[in-house]
């Protein structure tokens, strides 16, 4: 549809990269951007990333131009014409933060050593195990609904629970043993991480949710 109507398609992949497998080239996406602090584990304030389709890697495109987007081979020649890198680097404007890049590189090396297929496969198995465990709790739907799609191809690792009552109390209790995220007014977000969470930890989490629900009976 975008191609037929001469529309440039850009995607915000904020919490997708490192969490969901995607092939931007096969979908002919024009450009995309994402953060790295969460599912790529580079930490708060971590650098972002960009993707630019190779069909846009050309010299005559109108864009913001900066020192670090110029080819390194001619950067210090002080040419009057912008000599862009023929990659996404041609869109870089200024000096990236070196320390943050170092932290990001260390994280990416962990992903590479683990193998991306292994990471995504374990993530799917972990989140499926979590989903099945939560939905098997007796009378869970009296307290919360699972608002994340059940089909693993329609989601990443995060499972969101929409609480019908006592959401802050639930969050307070579960946070004594597990790291989860609370979003007002009544959503608790849970995301088992394949690089360091185990199936046993997911089992313990589901058991704790079950215990808390039973304590309200």
Question: Over which residues does each language-model region extend?
Answer:
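Pyridoxal 5′-phosphate
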Residues: 1-217
